[in-house]
Each structure stands twice: as C-alpha cells, then as structure tokens.
Amino acid sequence: MCIRDRDKYLGTEELNLILREEIAGLLSEINSGNDSEFSLTSNHKPYVIMVVGVNGAGKTTTIGKLAHQFRKQGYKVVLGAADTFRAAAIDQLQVWAERVEVPIVKQNMGSDPASVAFDTLESAVSNQADVVIIDTAGRLHNKVNLMNELTKIKRVMHKVVPNAPHEILLVLDGSTGQNAFEQAKQFTAATEVNALAVTKLDGTAKGGVVIGISDQFQVPVKYIGVGEGIEDLQVFNKMEFIDSFFKK
C-alpha cells in the first residue's frame, strides 16, 4: 500500500510513526548511539582525530569546539595545524587554541603537513595528552593530490602512534545540500572517513542532508553543529534528531 492510499486509513500519529521508522532505517545501525556526552570510544592514548573537509564548512570551528568539549570532560588535548596551505588556517586554529586553552603545534605556511602531524603526535606522547586533533588542508587540486597528501600524513603518524589516526572526521556544511554530497563523495573516496560532523544545522537548515549522506556513504554522524556558540557542537543522538523533525 502506498502512502497516498494509506492516508485514507491512517491518522497523523500513525503516519508520523511510519515516517519515524523510515528515517531510522535510513540512518541505519551505524548511527545507533544515543550518547549525549563527549567521550572517547577507545582506549588508545593519545586518541588521534584527523579532521578533513573543504574550507568554509566549519572545519576549524568544529576542531575548536571539539577541543573545548573534550577539555571540559577532563581530557588533555593537543591541536595540530597541518593545513599549511593557508596562513589564515594556521592563524584561526591558533585563535581557537588560545580561546579554549589547549596547546597547538604549528609551523610556517608552506611547511610539510606530514611534518606538522609528526611533531604534534611527538608532543602529545611526550606530554601524555589524551586527545590529538589534526587539521588538514581543505583544498587540493584534485582527488589524487588529496589522497596522496592524506596518505602521507597517516603514514608519518604511524611512526609515532602505530594505529593513528583512530578517527577520520569529515566536516560537512549541512546547509549546502548537494554540495555536501559531492564533498562526502570526494573525501570518502580519498581516505577512510569513519565519522561525520555536520555543521550549520541551525536556522533554515533542517538536517535532511544528514539522513541522505549517512545512508549513501554508510558513515555514522558523530557530531552536529547547531549554532555559533562554543557550546553549540553536540554529540549526534539518533532519536533526538528524528524527534526534531516532528516537533510542532
């Protein structure tokens, strides 16, 4: 029976229940978590997060807010400024590091990103940090360049922390619709993305892109950005997210 036919027999509550089940199915078991706290999901120390995504998606802001949340939970955090293609990227991460009071490892613009990642992990190990968050370049000329750059960074990380990075977090702008799909396609093809952070889901952006991207690429959504404030990065809660579509 199609939904149009079911309209004759089902009320609003029944239809909402069907829609909830459909959305839950699209988000799939990979988004089964109902956590609300920022916590580490592994015993690796340091736990290394490599953050990827295009410039303008909210990558640096997400890193800063993530560092803030982990620090609030009592974790010792180190940032690595491995987006060395833009001076602004290094400067912006420095501002966030100062704001949330965590150390940052950086070099000059044009430096080898893999070298920055190596230095960051060495610093984290020597200082017994719990979490390392590495920023990476958002724009390379093509997918091959992107893949080569990220592969090199990972290879160098392995020399310091054998299984690093433990998480490759792709940051997507939830308000850009089809562009977010294209970015997800590019980055999931270039490296082993295993978590998503979807930003700018406040205002008119309703978050439908979250459902489509998670379903198509089979990568769990881990964080959502719902505003400009430092506290406006949330751990993705599947049931709360689905409920938000049905609030009156």
Each language-model region and where it sits:
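Short glycine-rich anion-binding loops that position phosphate/pyrophosphate groups of nucleotides
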Residues: 137-139
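Nucleotide/phosphate-binding catalytic cleft detector across ATP-hydrolyzing
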Residues: 1
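Conserved catalytic-core segment of NTP-binding enzymes
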Residues: 92, 113-127, 141-247
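Primarily NTPase-proximal linker/entry elements flanking Walker-type ATP/GTP-binding cores
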Residues: 4-82, 89-109, 117-125, 129-134
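Residue-level signal for short, function-critical loop segments
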Residues: 83-84, 174
